[in-house]
Amino acid sequence: MQPQIILITGASSGFGKITAQMLSEQGHIVYGTSRKPSENIGKVRMLVVDVTNSISVRQAVEQIISEQGRMDVLINNAGMGIGGALELATEEEVSMQMNTNFFGVVNMCKAVLPYMRKARRGKIINISSIGGVMGIPYQGFYSASKFAVEGYSEALALEVHPFHIKVCLVQPGDFNTGFTDNRNISELTGQNEDYADSFLRSLKIIEKEERNGCHPRKLGAAICKIVARKNPPFRTKVGPLVQVLFAKSKSWLPDNMMQYALRIFYAIR
């Protein structure tokens, strides 16, 4: 396979770092982004990019086009999570969540699409989440941001189909990455007597599942397959088998049963 010019956001750690390394090892020319200056990862060229800043995004894409002449694959991986009750989240917390996880994806796509349209080819891989299929308690705005990515990607795939541009969604379950330790916790939730106990029980379960989750190379391997395939599937679920099967069951399981199962799993009582 001809080496691809690939840009992956959020490549300084976790999924992004491992996936960038794996793609580079396969012979692709890989650029990674991070919000802060970061050393190159092997042959992966790191760029300082704030995905919430359209000017920063556009400058990075223009630099790659200037150096390589094209953009073959964009992987929107940059993301963050805020834990807490929906009612108590501040406007600043909600904006931070949506700006990074959703509008960051929008900014990146808007920057690369003119070049992909001109070339009449390209591939955009948006990292969503199983939390983008079902609302996770005390991760509500994270789920909302991923639901937004899902809807955006569905519409985008239709709009860019005439230009032979593929849009794909990857829905990870729980993986053992630095995401757990980097989660932002809303202080107001822990201080509220009505929510505190329920929140702490659920958070303990969430963090345990993440720490016992799959190795991130499993996700990296799935992304590498999508990059390699001419006609990849629109959606790919990756993670612990139980989580993948549960997410798939939403399409046929009655809503009240799904809600009941989630309450039991996350100790909502």
From Swiss-Prot:
Entry binding sites for NADP(+): Y142, K146
Q: Which GO terms describe its cellular component?
A: membrane
- Residue ranges the record marks as coiled coil: none
Any matching Pfam family: adh_short
- Give the location of motif GXSXG in residue numbers: 10-14
Catalyses which reaction(s):
sphinganine + NADP(+) = 3-oxosphinganine + NADPH + H(+)
Task: Specify the superkingdom.
Answer: Bacteria
Q: Does the keyword GTP-binding apply?
A: no
What's the Enzyme Commission number for this chain? 1.1.1.102
The keyword Ubl conjugation belongs to this UniProt entry's keyword annotation: no
Where does the chain bind NADPH? G10, S12, S13, G14, K36, D50, Y142, S143, A144, S145, K146, F175, N176, T177
Look up the record and name the pathway of this protein.
Lipid metabolism; sphingolipid metabolism
Q: Which residues form the active site?
A: S12, S128, Y142, K146
Family, according to the entry, reads as follows: Belongs to the short-chain dehydrogenases/reductases (SDR) family.
Q: What is this protein called?
A: 3-ketodihydrosphingosine reductase
